[in-house]
Amino acid sequence: MNSFLRCVAAVLALCAAAPAPAQGAEEKDNIAGPYVPTPWVIVDEMLKLAGIRGEDVVYDLGSGDGRLVITAAKRFGARGVGVELQTELVELARIGAKHEGVADRVKFVQGDLFETDIKDASVVMLYLLPRFVTRLVPRLRAELRPGTRIVSHDYPLAPWPPDKELSMDVAEKEMISGTSWTRLYYYVVPARVQGVWELTLPRALADAPLVVQITQEPHAIGGLIHHGNAELFLRDLTVQGEGVRFGLLYRTRLIAFEGTVGGKTMTGEARAGSVREPWTARYLGPLQR
């Protein structure tokens, strides 16, 4: 940590020790936990886990002194946005960005992270208390583009299972939060595929389109086809980013599908034995409840 950031840390410690101004109930409810600076070794691991690239737009929701966004910009050339409710932290982050020479690549916004427009993010960083992390899950899945990466420090986005986890001991953290144990959770936002789809297979595999009903929740996804009197289930249906994979046992043949979701269409390749042919699907509408 350079001398400037040591100075920032000292100022923040004084701010934390000072009496806090009175807050209304609504404002207090949206402060997503006390300010706890992320140790630098964890900053490094979060950026590494997210696979930050120069073309990324990194959002830090509850950005504190801005260290994650500033480091992403300085080290990788990424652009970034920090969202923080506490005014003094926003000002410190802006000073830090200017000092580190990245003020043209990052901005810090004083605002409510639950109301901030996040659709431009390609990466989202979180270090919030569990109830606030859970509260964000519907927004993250509904508003972020498929393929957006999320890294959450210490608390998972329940009930959404992570794509990866990383655990470590960080001695510096024990002095800050009382424990050295650290866990990072990595997620890739899936394409939204819930609804009714018309699946068209090559004639070598099926002579008519099939209607597929897909249900998609943070913790589970499944697909069902009504075919005559039979119910056919999509096997191992997986959506990661814009990629989709599943299997289907149809007329005694196991067909493996791989493809890409593009809004209201899917396209890809179907494989059954030696047969490899293209497949498509088009969105017909929402599920009937």
Task: Mark where each language-model region is.
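S-adenosyl-L-methionine
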Residues: 20-56, 87-120
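Conserved class I S-adenosyl-L-methionine
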Residues: 55-64
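Glycine-rich SAM-binding Motif I of class I
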Residues: 66-70
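Conserved SAM-binding motif I beta-strand of class I
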Residues: 79-84
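Conserved beta-strand signature within the Rossmann-like core of class I S-adenosyl-L-methionine
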Residues: 147-158
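Active-site capping/gating segments
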Residues: 156-198
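Central antiparallel beta-sheet cores of small beta-barrel/beta-sandwich binding domains
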Residues: 191-289
